[in-house]
A protein has these predicted regions:
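N-terminal secretory signal peptides that target proteins for export/translocation
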Residues: 1-2
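A composition-driven surface/loop motif
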Residues: 6-9, 16, 20, 24-327
């Protein structure tokens, strides 16, 4: 009788496993596959303690990894199929778009891109372009993306020989960190999908990294939430005046951004202390079409517009057609 119960339990377990999606069974089996089914091979990068895949054509990425990243050097379409690239064992961004390159990211299912010791979740270098789309028409495909937090990281814990790495926070989606407010971020286009982007320290949720401007940002659809570290999706959370912050969508604190154009979708953006929810200085923001927009500025800053009175230059905000909502 006991043997029958064990056998019945095993049958039930097999049956339940058969009901799980393939991605659940394959968790941890990170793959980069070409359209013809051929698997792309990565190469080791000892400096960053990581395996890197140079993407030169259309690929599908699936599975989970802690120490593998993609670099687009020309033009490619990357389908993220329930991919989880949470890099807590290496340096660099999960996905990097090189200077002058162009990448389209197509979302399928639940996807996570998380940088660890160095870099934004998606690095969009100067002159590069990234376009994010959902495979579905109802924005059920998701992307959660975050930049590296400010802090000191032990090299040996990431495969290095010793010592430590001290970094500032980075943007969720955007450019690298620099020491002056120059436009080092490329173009960021969001067309569909449900996207949550978080930046840390001076990094914007979407836009500029530490002391870097935000580049051109176009949002034409989707459900987009962008936060700078220290903010909260349920409302702005007060932090000390010396906390390092950036805009929700736009530039690093006190830095400009390229034009920000929002023509569709549902957009919520939360700026840090002294930073707008959406904007920069200088920066022109245009909201049009059927976009539903809410911008939460940190203390001393506008919901949509510029920084506090002591930082940055003037900008222009244009709202036409359906009016967005701005909260300070």
């Amino acid at each position: 009788m006991k043997g029958k119960r064990i056998w019945s339990g095993l049958l039930a377990l097999v049956f339940c496993l058969g009901l799980l999606p393939a991605t659940a069974l394959a968790a941890g089996n990170f793959t980069v596959t070409k359209l013809d089914g051929e698997t792309v091979a990565g190469s080791e990068n000892a400096e960053n303690y990581t395996k890197e895949y140079t993407v030169t054509e259309d690929v599908t990425v699936a599975g989970r990894t802690r120490n593998e990243r993609l670099i687009v050097k020309e033009e490619a379409t990357i389908t993220l199929n329930n991919a989880n690239m949470s890099l807590n064992e290496c340096k660099g961004s999960p996905i990097e778009i090189a200077e002058g390159a162009s990448a389209t990211l197509i979302l399928e299912g639940e996807n996570t891109l998380s940088a660890f010791a160095d870099g934004p979740g998606i690095l969009v270098n100067q002159g590069a372009t990234v376009t994010i789309q959902s495979q579905s028409d109802d924005n059920t495909d998701r992307l959660t993306v975050s930049g590296a937090k400010a802090g000191t990281y032990v090299s040996a814990e990431m495969g290095g020989g010793g010592g430590s790495i001290t970094t500032d926070g980075y943007a969720g989606i955007g450019g690298p960190n620099f020491d002056e407010a120059t436009n080092y971020t490329g173009a960021i286009n969001i067309e569909s999908g449900t996207i949550t982007a978080t930046g840390y320290s001076y990094g914007a949720g979407i836009g500029g990294g530490n002391f870097s401007s935000g580049g051109t940002i176009n949002i034409s659809g989707g459900v987009v939430t962008a936060l700078s570290g220290g903010t909260d999706p349920d409302g702005w959370v007060g932090v000390p005046a010396d906390t390092k912050m950036g805009a929700g969508i736009g530039g690093s604190q006190g830095c400009g951004s390229g034009d920000i154009n929002i023509s569709g979708g549902i957009v919520k953006a939360y700026g840090g202390y002294g930073c707008p929810g959406i904007g920069g200085a200088p920066c022109d923001v245009t909201i049009s079409g059927n976009a539903e927009v809410t911008g939460y500025g940190g203390d001393l800053a506008a919901g949509i517009g510029g920084y506090d009175k002591d930082k940055g230059e003037s900008n222009e905000v244009t709202i036409s057609d359906k009016i967005g909502r701005a909260h300070v």
